[in-house]
Amino acid sequence: MARLLIAASGTGGHVFPALGVAEKLSDYEIQWLGTPNRLEQSLVGDRYPFHTISVEGFQTRSPIKKLKILLGLLSSIFEVKQLIEQQKIDVVFTTGGYIASSAILAAKLSGIPAILHESNYIPGKVTKLLSRFCTTVALGFEGTKQYLPTTPTIWVSTPVRSQFYTSQPLDLNIPNDVPLIVIIGGSQGAVSVNQLVRQCVPYWLEMGAYVVHLTGKNDPNANSLQDPQYITLPFYDNMAGLLQRADLAVSRAGSGTLTELAITKTPAILIPYPFAAEDHQSFNAQVFVDAGAAYCYQQKELTDKILTDLVSDLLNHPDKLKEMSNKSSELAVMDSSEKLAKLIRDSI
């Protein structure tokens, strides 16, 4: 039985695609590499043996801090190399982020293949720096190839978990015959977007809509608005069922969320996270805007009136929502997980 080490940590955008690939490799012995006290620990649970290393990014101006981070990176590379050798790992798969540096370099030192999945339209720093050490870089967006001209790449889109491909029942008290708006701040939440949305919600409720608002865990005012038609949750595991039922989403533009919107044919109003590295969420969102699947507003330009009026207009014109839904589905790649799984198999 082949042995795979998955290095995926931090946010849902890194962890969920990795879980989607893992589901297609049930004949592999899989081990998971993460970081302490992050999202992956609860999501992976006891499905796979779980290992952790401590890694940090270099976002500091302090030379002493940078040196400390560099020494920590070197230490973590050798930790992962030791893990690879002890567990007789055959191939490493990573979805990027800080943890990918240690995983890719350890795989290189161990002489085994490393497959990197870059989900964003604009490649991250880790991808740009370390793609040369990878067997292949799998791309979430076809246009990303232009930023990695000398790297072996293949476009596969971004994997989602298997439940997105089958109808999922929704365990929330929402009637079948009412419009449903879903607010998605990403796995880390989005307090500023939450504040804006709460100013708009009363108008949408008056129209008869229900709103499910995923606030994240760090919003101090998450429960400040109370109404039977307004459901707030810090996190919801059945995103497949929720988006399958939704008429419209208001969302950040992380690559994983966008893929889930496409698979479920959900029209969207996108608000890119303004502090994302190299503004990659804006580039992600533009693909959906160009396709006619979404509207996009920068956070600094979006007001409660603009958002209220746009959502109200869309709810009043189901034909517009239907057209956006059709355009969204055209962006979906239904076999992304299978393509990545095959890439991993073929690398050994």
Swiss-Prot record:
<keyword id="KW-0131">Cell cycle</keyword>
<feature type="binding site">
    <location>
        <position position="281"/>
    </location>
    <ligand>
        <name>UDP-N-acetyl-alpha-D-glucosamine</name>
    </ligand>
</feature>
<feature type="binding site">
    <location>
        <position position="187"/>
    </location>
    <ligand>
        <name>UDP-N-acetyl-alpha-D-glucosamine</name>
    </ligand>
</feature>
<dbReference type="GO" id="GO:0005886">
    <property type="term" value="C:plasma membrane"/>
</dbReference>
<dbReference type="InterPro" id="IPR006009">
    <property type="entry name" value="GlcNAc_MurG"/>
</dbReference>
<dbReference type="GO" id="GO:0008360">
    <property type="term" value="P:regulation of cell shape"/>
</dbReference>
<dbReference type="GO" id="GO:0071555">
    <property type="term" value="P:cell wall organization"/>
</dbReference>
<dbReference type="GO" id="GO:0005975">
    <property type="term" value="P:carbohydrate metabolic process"/>
</dbReference>
<dbReference type="Pfam" id="PF04101">
    <property type="entry name" value="Glyco_tran_28_C"/>
</dbReference>
<dbReference type="InterPro" id="IPR004276">
    <property type="entry name" value="GlycoTrans_28_N"/>
</dbReference>
<dbReference type="GO" id="GO:0050511">
    <property type="term" value="F:undecaprenyldiphospho-muramoylpentapeptide beta-N-acetylglucosaminyltransferase activity"/>
</dbReference>
<keyword id="KW-0472">Membrane</keyword>
<comment type="function">
    <text>Cell wall formation. Catalyzes the transfer of a GlcNAc subunit on undecaprenyl-pyrophosphoryl-MurNAc-pentapeptide (lipid intermediate I) to form undecaprenyl-pyrophosphoryl-MurNAc-(pentapeptide)GlcNAc (lipid intermediate II).</text>
</comment>
<keyword id="KW-0961">Cell wall biogenesis/degradation</keyword>
<keyword id="KW-0328">Glycosyltransferase</keyword>
<feature type="binding site">
    <location>
        <position position="161"/>
    </location>
    <ligand>
        <name>UDP-N-acetyl-alpha-D-glucosamine</name>
    </ligand>
</feature>
<dbReference type="GO" id="GO:0051991">
    <property type="term" value="F:UDP-N-acetyl-D-glucosamine:N-acetylmuramoyl-L-alanyl-D-glutamyl-meso-2,6-diaminopimelyl-D-alanyl-D-alanine-diphosphoundecaprenol 4-beta-N-acetylglucosaminlytransferase activity"/>
</dbReference>
<protein>
    <recommendedName>
        <fullName>UDP-N-acetylglucosamine--N-acetylmuramyl-(pentapeptide) pyrophosphoryl-undecaprenol N-acetylglucosamine transferase</fullName>
        <ecNumber>2.4.1.227</ecNumber>
    </recommendedName>
</protein>
<dbReference type="GO" id="GO:0009252">
    <property type="term" value="P:peptidoglycan biosynthetic process"/>
</dbReference>
<dbReference type="InterPro" id="IPR007235">
    <property type="entry name" value="Glyco_trans_28_C"/>
</dbReference>
<keyword id="KW-0808">Transferase</keyword>
<keyword id="KW-0997">Cell inner membrane</keyword>
<dbReference type="GO" id="GO:0051301">
    <property type="term" value="P:cell division"/>
</dbReference>
<keyword id="KW-1003">Cell membrane</keyword>
<dbReference type="GO" id="GO:0030259">
    <property type="term" value="P:lipid glycosylation"/>
</dbReference>
<keyword id="KW-0573">Peptidoglycan synthesis</keyword>
<comment type="pathway">
    <text>Cell wall biogenesis; peptidoglycan biosynthesis.</text>
</comment>
<comment type="similarity">
    <text>Belongs to the glycosyltransferase 28 family. MurG subfamily.</text>
</comment>
<keyword id="KW-0133">Cell shape</keyword>
<dbReference type="Pfam" id="PF03033">
    <property type="entry name" value="Glyco_transf_28"/>
</dbReference>
<keyword id="KW-0132">Cell division</keyword>
<feature type="binding site">
    <location>
        <position position="120"/>
    </location>
    <ligand>
        <name>UDP-N-acetyl-alpha-D-glucosamine</name>
    </ligand>
</feature>
<feature type="binding site">
    <location>
        <begin position="11"/>
        <end position="13"/>
    </location>
    <ligand>
        <name>UDP-N-acetyl-alpha-D-glucosamine</name>
    </ligand>
</feature>
